[in-house]
Each structure stands twice: as structure tokens, then as C-alpha cells.
């Protein structure tokens, strides 16, 4: 029992420590100027993150004696390519939204992963969902809307933060691409025997290649290397960002493997809350009383979603046992 609790504690500290540090680095790099100049090359940031994730994934597989040779089989290439493209687009839209939204708004908005999925299925495929899913989406959307609207009306002064409709639209497309990525991954997992870490390696390898090609193409005029030459301190931040994100992914896989999805859902939920609070207090974002109501609505919505998922998993497990 002591060993079990010790492993769980290590997983919790690993996930919290990695992803809270990752979020701080991400917000600093994207939203804070370096000697008066802001970093404007999300592609380089995505390349650093995906390269480090591939490296960590290969080390994980090597440690567990898992071969990655099957990644280049023709039957996987089509799937991996499409996942890499949708994941790269998701990353692009996500980073682009940060130039038009405050970071707390982005964190809250990313909690509403159900919105684009339900919108796509309802309006395109004419599919219906259980009432609780509509309730969850309504609560989270209302919370994000309240927070974003009052971000604009309460922000004043030279360094005021403002959320624009363009930013919210970009965030919607980020979530939509996320949904497409996850759906395709589920299809691959259902069709082939493939570990999550191997999938992570393949997808991030594709993302690294796509971003690398973009950075050396004539379409890229952001000159990220010139920015690094002018502000070399960003290299340390980028390295911390890439390392903490990659290590956090490994802690997630380890937690899922050792303790199951219910424990992981609980840890992920509390991690989102801590990330939001850390952003507000560490970077001194101004949050009004009504905006705290919006935050509360969002976290009530994702708590309801997590609770129902846990209940559903428990009932499924009982049915299998009987």
C-alpha cells in the first residue's frame, strides 16, 4: 500500500510540476516581450516541443524494450500524416489565438473541447447527444463568454488586456483540429495494436518535419533565428518549455498505465484549475468578481464532465465483471 501511494504521489507531483512549469514558460514566451520585442514564431516553438517529445518517447520505448520500427510501415503512414497535419494546424491556431486573447481566456477556452465536436455532429451529421452534454457545453461556453466579455469591459490603462472575436474564432478552430486529431487517433487505436507512446512519437515526428519544412521555406518571413540572436535568453525558456511538456506527457502515460483513466481524469481536472490560478497570480492578470463567476462556471462544467466520465467508467467495469 505504501508503495502504491508513493507511486501515485510521484505521478501527481510529476504532472503538476511539469505542466504548471510548461504553462508558465508558454505564457512567458508568447505573451511577454524580450527587451521590448515579442516572439512571433510559434512554428519554432512547436518544432522544439515536438522534437523533445520524440526524443523522450524513444527513450521511454527503449527503457521498456519496445521497438519503433513499425512506425514506417505503409499502413500507418497515411494515418500518421493526417494526424500530424491536423495536430500542426491545431497548434498553429492555438498559438495564433494567444496573440488576440489573454492567457487565462485561452486556458478556459481549451476546457470546452466538446463544443466543436458537438457543433460538427449536430449541424453537419444531424446527430443528437444526451442532455447532459448540452448542459456541460452551455456551462463552459457561458463561463468563457462571461470571462472574455468582462475582460474587455474591465481592462483599462496602457497594459490592459483585451479579448477579440478573432481570437475566440482561432481558439474554436484549435479545438476543432484537436477533435479531428483525437478522432483519427481513436480510429488507429481501434484498428491496430499500437501503444500510446509509439503514437506520440510518430505524430510528433510528423509535426517536427512539417514545422521544420515551413521554417526553411520562403513562406516563413518571421526570422526566428534573428530573434534568438538578438535575445539569446529565450533559448533557456524554450528548452524548459520543451522539456517540461515532454516529461509531463510521459508522466501522463505512466499514470494511465499504473492507475487507470479515472485517476488521470481527476489529476488532469485539478491541474487545469491550478494552471488557471497560477497564470492569474504569477503574471498579475486583473480578474473582476464577475469574471470569477465565469471561471467557476467553466470548472463546474468540466467537473461535471469528469464526474460523469468516472461514473460511466465504473458502470462499464461492473458490467464487464458481471
Swiss-Prot record:
May be involved in specific transport of UDP-Gal from the cytosol to the Golgi lumen. Involved in the maintenance of optimal conditions for the folding of secretory pathway proteins in the endoplasmic reticulum. Pfam families: UAA. The chain crosses the membrane at residues 4-24, 43-63, 76-96, 105-125, 129-149, 164-184, 199-219, 250-270, 290-310. This is UDP-galactose transporter homolog 1. Keywords: Endoplasmic reticulum, Glycoprotein, Membrane, Sugar transport, Transmembrane, Transmembrane helix, Transport. It is found in: Endoplasmic reticulum membrane. It is a multi-pass membrane protein. The keyword Membrane applies. The gene is hut1.
Amino acid at each position: 500500500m505504501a508503495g502504491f501511494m508513493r507511486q501515485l504521489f510521484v505521478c501527481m507531483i510529476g504532472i503538476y510540476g511539469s505542466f504548471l512549469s510548461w504553462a508558465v514558460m508558454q505564457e512567458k514566451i508568447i505573451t511577454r516581450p524580450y527587451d521590448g520585442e515579442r516572439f512571433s514564431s510559434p512554428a519554432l516553438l512547436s518544432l522544439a516541443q515536438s522534437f523533445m517529445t520524440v526524443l523522450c518517447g524513444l527513450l521511454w520505448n527503449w527503457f521498456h524494450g519496445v521497438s519503433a520500427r513499425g512506425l514506417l510501415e505503409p499502413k500507418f503512414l497515411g494515418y500518421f500524416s493526417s494526424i500530424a497535419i491536423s495536430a500542426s494546424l491545431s497548434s498553429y491556431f492555438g498559438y495564433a489565438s494567444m496573440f488576440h486573447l489573454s492567457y487565462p481566456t485561452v486556458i478556459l477556452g481549451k476546457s470546452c473541447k466538446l463544443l466543436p465536436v458537438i457543433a460538427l455532429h449536430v449541424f453537419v451529421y444531424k446527430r443528437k447527444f444526451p442532455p447532459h452534454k448540452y448542459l456541460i457545453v452551455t456551462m463552459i461556453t457561458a463561463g468563457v463568454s462571461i470571462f472574455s466579455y468582462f475582460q474587455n469591459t474591465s481592462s483599462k490603462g496602457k497594459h490592459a488586456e483585451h479579448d477579440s472575436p478573432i481570437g475566440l474564432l482561432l481558439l474554436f478552430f484549435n479545438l476543432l483540429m484537436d477533435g479531428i486529431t483525437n478522432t483519427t487517433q481513436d480510429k488507429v487505436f481501434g484498428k491496430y495494436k499500437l501503444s500510446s507512446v509509439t503514437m506520440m512519437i510518430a505524430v510528433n515526428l510528423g509535426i517536427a518535419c512539417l514545422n521544420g519544412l515551413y521554417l526553411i521555406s520562403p513562406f516563413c518571413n518571421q526570422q526566428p533565428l534573428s530573434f534568438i540572436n538578438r535575445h539569446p535568453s529565450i533559448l533557456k525558456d524554450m528548452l524548459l518549455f520543451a522539456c517540461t511538456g515532454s516529461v509531463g506527457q510521459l508522466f501522463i502515460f505512466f499514470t494511465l498505465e499504473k492507475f487507470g483513466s479515472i485517476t488521470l481524469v481527476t489529476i488532469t481536472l485539478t491541474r487545469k484549475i491550478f494552471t488557471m490560478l497560477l497564470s492569474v497570480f504569477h503574471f498579475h492578470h486583473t480578474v473582476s468578481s464577475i469574471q470569477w463567476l465565469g471561471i467557476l462556471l467553466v470548472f463546474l462544467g468540466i467537473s461535471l464532465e469528469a464526474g460523469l466520465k468516472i461514473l460511466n467508467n465504473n458502470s462499464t467495469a461492473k458490467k464487464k465483471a458481471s
